[in-house]
Amino acid sequence: MQFAPLLLGVFLLCGSARGSDSSASNAITCFTRGLDLRKETEDVLCPANCPLWQFYVFGDGIYASLSSVCGAAIHRGVITNAGGAVRVQTLPGQENYPAVHANGIQSQVLSRWASSFSVTPGTNNLALEAVGRSVATARPATGKRPKKTLEKKAGNKDCKADIAFLIDGSYNIGQRRFNLQKNFVGKVAVMLGIGTEGPHVGVVQASEHPKIEFYLKNFTAAKEVLFAIKELGFRGGNSNTGKALKHAAQKFFSMENGARKGIPKIIVVFLDGWPSDDLEEAGIVAREFGVNVFIVSVAKPTTEELGMVQDIGFIDKAVCRNNGFFSYQMPSWFGTTKYVKPLVQKLCSHEQMLCSKTCYNSVNIGFLIDGSSSVGESNFRLMLEFISNVAKAFEISDIGSKIATVQFTYDQRTEFSFTDYTTKEKVLSAIRNIRYMSGGTATGDAISFTTRNVFGPVKDGANKNFLVILTDGQSYDDVRGPAVAAQKAGITVFSVGVAWAPLDDLKDMASEPRESHTFFTREFTGLEQMVPDVIRGICKDFLDSKQ
């Protein structure tokens, strides 16, 4: 009988351990989410030393179920990063999960989710700690492997884009077609290849008032995005697409909300029928913010309905460019699978994103060309070919890059200013038609003239200003002072010398670092080889200015 208490104690200890398998001893990983748990109330054990910066937490007090359980527990103050026992209570979904910084974790905003959970201190701490020690390096006491969390994949690295799907949530589309629209958007999202190093997506719903459903930063896995799209609710109201587009262009693509530097910004606008408001102004705002707008129109107005449309040209005025690439039509929301791949191919065509703010479409380049007698007519033509080849690399438009040219001898002549031509074809034609002046060489006066009269009117614009000086000889006046003044006015100066142009003068005119802003060739035929270097120099300076 003396062994009975001992045996009873062993039995109770083992029974307690077995009981903890089903209720209190569920060891989880740092990234187990609320939706990974299957019980309404569950006691779990969080491990120690979780990387706080990797937690995804949505809400405060009540957390969306896609939040990390351990992250939420630390955020709430239930445990520290030393780990510990947590009781998780499943709750209904809700709207407007807030963003709050607490205990080293920044939770994120989420507009709506289907289920939630709360966290409180766990029970049976001693049993949990014992189990925790036994599974510190292997598996939980149940003998089962820990639940796998969603692996973050790199995604399609050939399709780097930040994309907002602006879906139609108006009464025009109705609940049934709204669900079909969500299915189509989900298919597009999957085919894009969403991932940490691939495309990131978010959703904005257009209705009476626009609503950002989730941001770029909220999800970087296709499964998460699919689930979030599935949970979107239909809002109803007028199809104020213009209002939603303007709101998205201004608010959606901030660095705080997940936008990435150097990645094209895209808004894909889904429109069932036609908008209730004006899209032209919204399109202008989007282009000013460097956003590439696509319009996917479904069930376009019939002939009888055209009288109800405010502006039948609303698509052409809203898209990034009216060249056919940015507009996409589907006859209905039924049988849309075949339209998924062509749309994805468009969205992944990085080189076609003409409205992104890049060095190619966000600069003003002024060419100051030497027309002195030492150049000669034939060499002057080679100089014009040089500036034409540089200009060809840039997207010239009324909202993009702009080109101006000044020819100088002792005098100066503005061949054309930044506002004279807004297409590449017209700029190249104007360059071809420049007539050789012949005369002396007063480069310093020409720099001052160009700074004042050519760059002066655009100094407060959005584009970055560049001056490329092309000369074949020594100036009769001072060049350093005027060049410094130009640089103080915000103009980056590149100097290109040919033949007898003194290297000291070229460096005196060039911006810092002078070595990378100074070019020289003995022969005029060597100018052609410098074209890529000058273009790269402009783009490097542009990118550096954006850091």
Swiss-Prot record:
The cysteines covalently paired via disulfide bonds are C30-C46, C50-C70
* Signal peptide stretch: 1-19
Found, by tissue, as follows: Expressed in inner ear structures; the spindle-shaped cells of the basilar papilla. Weaker expression found in the inferior and superior fibrocartilaginous plates and skeletal muscle.
What GO terms fall under cellular component here? collagen-containing extracellular matrix; extracellular region
Domain LCCL intervals: 24-117
InterPro entries reported in the protein's UniProt record: ECM_Assembly_Org, LCCL, LCCL_sf, VWF_A, vWFA_dom_sf
Q: Where in the cell is it found?
A: Secreted
Give the sugar-modified residues.
Answer: N218
Q: Which SMART domains match?
A: LCCL, VWA
Task: Give coiled-coil spans as residue ranges.
Answer: none
Transmembrane portions of the chain: none
| Molecular-function annotations in GO | collagen binding
Record keywords: Disulfide bond, Glycoprotein, Repeat, Secreted, Signal
Q: Residue limits of the VWFA domain?
A: 162-347, 364-534
Q: PANTHER family per the record?
A: COCHLIN, COLLAGEN ALPHA
Under the subunit heading, UniProt states:
Monomer.
Q: What does this protein do?
A: Plays a role in the control of cell shape and motility in the trabecular meshwork.
Q: What is this protein called?
A: Cochlin
Specify the taxonomic lineage: Eukaryota, Metazoa, Chordata, Craniata, Vertebrata
